[in-house]
Structures are given as structure tokens and as C-alpha cells.
């Protein structure tokens, strides 16, 4: 019921969110490093 369609939502969500967080944190780190 809920568990049957939950993976089909979580898999692309995790696959998109984690790279986005990684790129965002890396971008912020590089920007702060260049400013200082």
C-alpha cells in the first residue's frame, strides 16, 4: 500500500537531493574560500 510506491518516490528523491546538497556545500565552500 504505502510501502509499495514509497521506494519509487524515495529513490529519485535521494538520487537528486544528495548530489544537490553535495554540490551546494562544495560551491559555498569554494566561494567562501575565494572571498577570504
From Swiss-Prot:
GO terms for cellular component: chloroplast thylakoid membrane; photosystem I. SUPFAM superfamilies: Subunit VIII of photosystem I reaction centre, PsaI. It comes from the Eukaryota. The chain crosses the membrane at residues 7-29. Pfam families: PSI_8. It is a single-pass membrane protein. The keyword Lyase does not apply. It is found in: Plastid, Chloroplast thylakoid membrane. Keywords: Chloroplast, Membrane, Photosynthesis, Photosystem I, Plastid, Thylakoid, Transmembrane, Transmembrane helix. Its main location: plastid. One of its GO terms (biological process) is photosynthesis. NCBIfam families: PRK11877.1 (NF008830), PS_I_psaI (TIGR03052). Belongs to the PsaI family. PANTHER family: PHOTOSYSTEM I REACTION CENTER SUBUNIT VIII, PTHR35775. May help in the organization of the PsaL subunit. This is Photosystem I reaction center subunit VIII. The lineage of its organism: Eukaryota, Viridiplantae, Streptophyta, Embryophyta, Anthocerotophyta.
Amino acid at each position: 500500500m504505502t510501502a509499495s510506491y514509497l521506494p519509487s518516490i524515495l529513490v529519485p528523491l535521494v538520487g537528486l537531493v544528495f548530489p544537490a546538497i553535495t554540490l551546494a556545500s562544495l560551491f559555498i565552500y569554494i566561494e567562501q574560500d575565494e572571498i577570504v
